[in-house]
Amino acid sequence: MNTSVSFPATSRRSVARHPVWTVSVLVAAAVLAGCADMSGITPQARLRDPASVGLVATAPSAVAAPTVSTEWWHAMGDAQLDALVAQALQNNPSLKVAQARLARAQAVTEVADAALLPQINGAVDLTRQRYTETGAVPAPLAGSIRSTGTLQLNASWELDFFGKYRAALDAALGTVNAAEADAQAARVLLASNVARSYIKLARTEAQLVVARRTLAQREETLGLVRDRVSAGLDSQLEQHQSEGGLPEARQQIEALQEQSQLTRNALGALVGDPKVALVLSAPALAAIKNMDLPPAIPADLLGRRADIAAARWRVEAAGKDVVNAKTQFYPNINLVAFAGLSSIGLNRLIGSDSLQWGVGPALRLPIFEGGRLRANLRGKTADLDAAVESYNASVLDAVHDVADQVASARSITRQQTEQQAAQKSAESAYGIAVQRYKAGLGNYLNVLTAETNVLVQRRQAVDLAARALDVQVGLARAVGGGYTAAALPVQQVAGE
C-alpha cells in the first residue's frame, strides 16, 4: 500500500503567500524517512586486498609498467598471423556480441540519466459526447450533445533528495564500464585464441615435415635391407621389420594432415570466414619470433586485466543497486505543474477564458509493502556479495594464471636446452648405427632402436618449440594483452 500526500494546485501568488508548504513537505519527508527499517541487512563479502595475493609485496617494481602492446601479436613477426587477427577482430560474432552488450549498457545509462531531469509531455483531447439527464450535470448541459476539448502541457520533476536516481545512474555507469572492459577482454581472448590456433597449425605442419622425413628414411633403409637380403647377409625377418615401418609412417602423415585441416577449420571459424581454411599457407614454426614478456607477475596486474576490471565495476554497480534499494524506503517528492486550454464547445477552446494551470508538490511514502522493500534490499545485498566474491575469484584466477605461465616459460627454456643435447646425441647415434649396418658391423635392431630415439627427439623438439610460443601467447593474455584500466573504483564495498 502506498500513502500519498498531495497538495492542490494553486496560483503562483498563493504559493508565495504560503512558503510554509514547501517547508512542511521537507519536514514530513524527513520524519517519515526515519521510519524506514533496514536493520539486519548488510553486505557480508569483502574485497581481497592485492597484497593478500602477493601482487605488491613480492613483485619487483621493475615490471610495474605496462610491457605488452595492445597489438602484441605483431611482435611474433608473422604477416599472415597479423592478417588473421585483424580479420577476426573485425568479423568474429562473439566480439560483436560483446560490443552489442556495451551499446545496450550505454542506452540504459541514458535512460537513468533522463530520470534526473524534469519530464514534460503534451496532451490533446477532443471529445463529442451526450451529457446524462439523470446525473449531476446541471441544465442546460443535461441532455445536450456537446464537443469538449483540452490542450495541455504537463510537467513533473521528482526531487532526488535521497539519491535514488543518482544511485541508479551510477549503477548504470558501472555496468557500462564493466561492459567496456568485457569487450576489451573479449578482444584479448580472441586475439590469443587466433594466435594459439595458428601456432598449433605451425606445430602440425612441422610434425608433418618430421613424419615425411621419417618415411623417406625408412624407404631408404628398406632398400638397404632388401639389398642385404638379396646378398644373403640378412633374413626375411629384417625385411619384414623394415617394411612394417612404412605403413606406420604413412598413417602418421595422414593423421597429421587431418589435424592440420581441423585446425584450419577452427581458424576459419575464429576469423569469421571459413574460406580461410582453403587459402591459408602452411606457417613455419621456426619463423615465428619470441616475444619480450614480463619475467614475473606484474605488481599492477589488477589494472591490466580487463576481466578483473569488469568484475570490479560489477561490484561498484551492485553497490549502487544496494544504495538505490535503500532509497526505496524513503519518500518521493515531486513538483508537478500543468497549463493549457479546456472548454466545452470547440469554438471557445482557443481563448484566454479557456486557460487553466496549476502547480504544487506531492509527497509519497511507502508505509506497508508486505515486506517487498526489505526483500528487494536483501536481494540486492546478496547480488553485491556475489559480485564481490566473483571479483575475488577473478583476482585469484588471474594470479594463478600468470604464475602458471611464468613457471611454464621458465621450465620450457630449461627443457629445450636438455632436449637439444639429447637430439644431438640421438642423431649421431642413428648415423653411426646406419653406417655400421651398411658395413655389416651392426644388426638391424640397432638401426631400429636408434631410429626410434631420433624420431622421439625430433617430435619433442617441435612440441617444445610450439609450446614455448603457446606459453608466450598465454602469458601475453594473462598479463592483460596490453589492456590498462583508465581508473578503477576505490577499494571498498559500495552500498554499505
Language-model-detected regions and their locations in the chain:
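Periplasmic alpha-helical coiled-coil/stalk elements that build and connect Gram-negative outer-membrane
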Residues: Y165, A181-I297, S408, I412, ...
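Short flexible linkers and secondary-structure junctions
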Residues: A36-N193, I333-A337, I367-L377
